[in-house]
Amino acid sequence: MSIMIIGLTGGIASGKSTVSKYLAEKGFKVYDADKIAKDISEKKSVQEEIISTFGNKILDKNGNIDRKKLKEIVFENKEKLEKLNGIIHPKVINFYKELKEKKTDKVIIFDVPLLFESGIDKFCDKILVVISDYEVQLNRIIERDKINRELAEKIIKSQLSNEERIKKADVVIENNSNLEDLFKKVERFCETI
């Protein structure tokens, strides 16, 4: 069976997850890298590796990893972010590699925020990028994640720029308007699959 793998990516708060959910509702098989990474990071062996790398300062009072503390640490320091990604990314990449080899569905969507940075784009036949203007993105993050502007800016700056993503994309969907407009654009994309 011939299989098409679509890599779906976009910066934080660009609307990528909304597009991902919409595609899943349309019946496409979607594999969300954030969920896969979260599941991987909850394995005891991986948690031990994260704690030994970042120390007890990332733990809450119950001895569990405090994701908010960890996020603040890794987005303050690029080397620390790379260390965390070095623990998680190889395991996520392996998951996608195994999935591609299984050839289970006709069309599979890899929903990966760091598609290019992780190298997962190499497994994809087509790349769909969702972008939003910087200020739109910033306001969405602040509202959604209840974080301050400074941390939101650091998170955006830690990722590839829209310009860099666009260069590597087969299809670009701009999401600066409302959901109805976004879904119309996704429908047009679906007609090309």
Swiss-Prot record:
Q: What is its EC number?
A: 2.7.1.24
Q: Which UniProt keywords apply?
A: ATP-binding, Coenzyme A biosynthesis, Cytoplasm, Kinase, Nucleotide-binding, Transferase
Identify the InterPro entries for this entry.
Answer: Depp_CoAkinase, P-loop_NTPase
List the Gene3D superfamilies hit by this protein, alphabetically: P-loop containing nucleotide triphosphate hydrolases (3.40.50.300)
Source organism superkingdom: Bacteria
Single GO molecular function: dephospho-CoA kinase activity
Main subcellular location of this protein, as a coarse class: cytoplasm
The pathway is: Cofactor biosynthesis; coenzyme A biosynthesis; CoA from (R)-pantothenate: step 5/5
Record's CDD domains?
A: DPCK (cd02022)
| Xref: Pfam families | CoaE
Q: Which residues form the DPCK domain?
A: 5-193
Q: Does the keyword Methyltransferase apply?
A: no
Q: Where in the cell is it found?
A: Cytoplasm
Reaction catalyzed = 3'-dephospho-CoA + ATP = ADP + CoA + H(+)
Which sites bind ATP?
A13, S14, G15, K16, S17, T18
Note whether Transferase occurs among the keywords. yes
| One of the GO biological process terms | coenzyme A biosynthetic process
Q: Name one GO cellular component term.
A: cytoplasm
Q: What does this protein do?
A: Catalyzes the phosphorylation of the 3'-hydroxyl group of dephosphocoenzyme A to form coenzyme A.
The record's family statement is:
Belongs to the CoaE family.
* Protein name in UniProt: Dephospho-CoA kinase
Organism annotation: Fusobacterium nucleatum subsp. nucleatum (strain ATCC 25586 / DSM 15643 / BCRC 10681 / CIP 101130 / JCM 8532 / KCTC 2640 / LMG 13131 / VPI 4355)
Gene assigned in the entry: coaE
